[in-house]
Amino acid sequence: MSKGKYVKRTFPLAGLHCAGCAARVEKILNAQTGVVAASVNLAASTAAVEYDTMQTSPERLRQAVQEGGYDMLADSDDDTPDELERMNRERYRDLKRRAFWAVVLAIPVVVIGMFFMDMPYGGAIMALLSAPVVFWLGRGFFVNAWQQLRHRSATMDTLVALSTGIAYLFSLFNLVFPEFWLSRGVDPHVYFEAAAVIIAFILLGRTLEEKAKGDTTASLKKLIGLQPKNAIVVAADGTQTEIPISRIRVGDLLAVRPGEKIAVDGAVCEGDSYVDESMLSGEPLPVHKEPGTKVFAGTINQKGSFHFRAEKVGAATMLAQIIRMVQEAQGSKAPVQKLADKIAGIFVPAIIGIALLSFVLWLVFDPSGGLTHGILAAVTVLVIACPCALGLATPTAVMVGIGKGAEKGILIRDAVSLETAGKIDTVVMDKTGTLTEGKPVVTDIVWANGDDRAKAVFFSLEKLSEHPLADAVVHYFAGVPTLNVERFGSLTGKGIEGTVDGVRYFAGSRRLLDEQGIVVGKELNIEAQRLSAEAKSIVWFADSEQALAVAAIADRIKDSSVEAVRELQAAGIDVYMLTGDSRAVAGHIAEKAGIRHFEAEILPQDKAAFVKRLQTLGHKVAMAGDGINDSAALAQADLSIAMGGGSDIAMDVAQMTIISSDLRKIPEAIQLSKQTVRTIRQNLFWAFIYNLVGIPVAAGALYPVSGFLLNPMIAGAAMALSSVSVVANSLRLKYRR
């Protein structure tokens, strides 16, 4: 049997109206051969499906969904965002139009029912006005209910169709055959206004809900909007042609003019400019780009112009990967949602059972008016029950939370990671590249005689060296003129030498200077000892007679690291630093960063064991790293955080990626997680309370005590409000600090 190829894709869905619909489609997809896992997001109207391409295809999946009474977009990934946007716009416009006319027609029905019931032909006018509301504007409820019935299923639309259909037909019977009741001493009532207003309120509620759901995906739309449509390709003869980005190939030379968006990922070949990367990294300051530096799709060029060579195109660009990550994350389910999903799955059949039970109980205990009261109570129960609030409680909050993270340059892999982040009590971080810049830089330089010529000689010597520390000196002196060095030589383990204008110069260790009999001044010696005590590498520069300068080189702590550590500790989170460096170097870095706990001289394989040791002590551990040597520890941690400048392997393992490598994003992510989980709990609490209180009241539980029987119109308004309030509460997340 051939080995299959597994892919994970997100497909837009049409026809989802409630949590029951989402549960039904999810069940259909998971039942298909070749599907590993499928998850439906009601708030986004999407299905995230992992499947074996050898056993099934998007077209087969779409066919299965269509047979269930729904629809799924199965076109190529490139077309999906635009097509999804078009579908959402059309759905919103259709809902708004139907809601408007339903309200227009329902208002006179309510006015007649409340104030002019005794007017001639009042009942007939109400029947005529409410018929188009129920059976034309509300036809979608009946069509969907019938499709679900054919598949032995029931959803929110089943409840609406049953309640409004029963209310209308019962009223029509009472209007046409009033003597049936009058002969039994019962005054016949009509409930046309209830049927019309229920449809109007639900359509209005769904319109507001659709608008609010659109706001929850605003962050994703913003990311998709970063992708330019066209780019300028430069031919071998220098001619420039504008082409769609879909035609760009790896290796193409592209031109970028001031103010333009960069089309694909690549490396600058010619020219320089500043590029605004804030939409990807969350960093506000433009980044300088010169030959050799990387540029990314979706970022915006400022005032300069440059040419760059395409390295990653289409789905391989960083922006495309971020969009895919955010889509998959927003479509994922938090553990807290599992209970709500189970309840939503059995909700509709249970409500139909409660409605029938309330009808029977009214018939038994109130023989005189029981039929009327029973039908009214059953209709109200069907109307007020709302699985949508339960179904929307978690995904709307997750979508807003993950979208907000993406805007800040924090990529969260899925809802589970988002929920886990709020439980973290310990953060372990690698030193090199995570806490520090990850490359040696000159932190201090002390001169005995620091004229421009001496600087030029030091720079020219180090420029010829292959030692790793030489790059730091060369970078430090960037812009200094290069002098001609003769008789250059490398003294293994000690340093380098060379002659400039007949004078011999040396750069390297103190041992080299001592062997050459070079005099070291007292002040330089004291400075060298001080810098060495700070765990910095020392490079001496001298001529053949005396030491001219001492340079200190170290892997500098990031400006953001100290503040990040302080914020984490202030939040009650322990911070540990791991490094393979000596205890002296580790101790100095930890002290400067304000870290109380550190492990030095630790091997890559020991990092995972250290994380596991903390976990056995009961800690919830987040590991932040940037390299291949961190991948095992990242995989072991409860929450793995990759720093954006690191290796692809670290990012593949990580549940969270900080694009800018700014450690301050870690406390931000933890705070965002806590806010999101708090919002989910609030949503679920109110959704449960609404149904637990509303359904018994609708069934007539208060009638024996107070004579109060809930009007179906009020029930319809309450049901619509419950869904809208859940989405609105989730949207509050966007504006919290």
Spans of model-derived segments:
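Conserved ATP-binding TGD loop and adjacent catalytic N/P-domain core of P-type ATPases
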Residues: 500-502, 537, 542-682
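Flexible metal-binding regulatory segments at protein termini and peripheral loops
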Residues: 1-121, 222, 239-242, 320, ...
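Conserved cytosolic catalytic headpiece of P-type ATPases
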Residues: 1-5, 41, 287-294, 368, ...
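Bilayer-spanning, highly hydrophobic alpha-helical transmembrane segments
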Residues: 99-109, 338-366, 378-386, 391-396, ...
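Actuator/coupling domain of P-type ATPases
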Residues: 60, 66-83, 123-126, 130-230, ...
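Membrane-embedded alpha-helical bundles of multi-pass transporters
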Residues: 115-118, 150, 169, 404, ...
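ATP-driven catalytic headpiece of P-type ATPases
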Residues: 97, 299, 425-466, 494-576, ...
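Conserved cytosolic catalytic loops of P-type ATPases
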Residues: 33-55, 59, 192, 221-316, ...
